[in-house]
Design a protein with these regions (language model features):
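Residue-level signal for threonine
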Residues: 43-44, 135
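Polar, glycine-rich mid-to-C-terminal structural blocks
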Residues: 1-41
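Acidic/polar-rich alpha-helix caps and helix-coil junctions
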Residues: 1, 5, 10-12, 53-225, ...
Length: 230
């Protein structure tokens, strides 16, 4: 989704808030060059631990630094994953200036090629009638996504990065994790886990680990299908 302006100057109706709401928190308005952000999205230990250390997507999706009040980058040394912000939409790379405190021109992904590859792999994994050739192709598409994530050539097999072909069930579980790694913070995960019938169980697992301060003022008013088990 393309946003052309930032609500400053001529193009005032084509702006978004990508990075302003879901960037690395920085609220010192005296440093506009950094880019104001309320930092409303943080990581979870589950998400962080899905990545291997040499997966380049981890420290891009989950910021490994924060900003001081003066706009200096400060590395995060704590093992507390709850304090790490979404890093995928960083305002420091925003080209349109002056930067606004309310809107940005940062685009938001609607459909990426890696998503298409993973959709193919999932469709093959979910189909009991999938043929051997389709399964091989599905693993290849999955591994292309992984190779890119590790900074490797997408068309060249890489030992230690590529997943071996181990059947449909293993493929589906691998796709579930890979969609999180590749498409994190892109507003797809909820629909994914609803589609897999895992929404309720996953929310319950998060509920017992999330810091109490995050949930003390909220309570459930409705469930999202499929219906939760008793």
């Amino acid at each position: 989704m393309e946003f052309y302006g930032n609500n400053v100057g001529t193009y005032t109706t084509t702006a978004g808030q990508v990075g302003r709401n879901n960037g690395i928190k920085f609220t010192n308005t005296d440093k506009p060059e950094i880019g104001y952000s309320i930092g409303s999205i943080r990581a979870t230990p589950y998400f962080f631990q899905l990545f291997e250390d040499d997966d380049e997507r981890r420290d891009w999706s989950i910021a490994d630094y924060e900003f001081t009040d003066e706009g200096e980058k400060k590395a995060i040394s704590s093992n507390n994953m709850w304090i790490r912000f979404c890093g995928k939409f960083r305002r420091e790379y925003e080209l349109l200036t002056p930067k606004s405190t309310t809107n940005t021109s940062t685009n938001f992904p609607i459909l990426r090629y890696s998503d298409v590859l993973l959709m193919y792999a999932e469709a093959v994994a979910a189909d009991e009638t999938s043929e051997a050739g389709e399964l091989t192709q599905a693993y290849e598409y999955l591994n292309r996504v992984r190779r890119r994530g590790y900074g490797r050539d997408v068309n060249t097999p890489v030992m230690g990065v590529d997943l071996p072909e181990e059947g449909r069930i293993s493929l589906l579980e691998a796709v579930k994790d890979e969609r999180a790694r590749e498409l994190g913070h892109e507003l797809l995960r909820k629909d994914d886990i609803i589609r897999w019938g895992e929404f309720y169980d996953r929310m319950q697992s998060v509920r017992v680990t999330v810091p109490e301060a995050y949930t003390s003022n909220y309570y459930c008013l409705l469930y999202t299908s499929p219906s939760p088990r008793d």
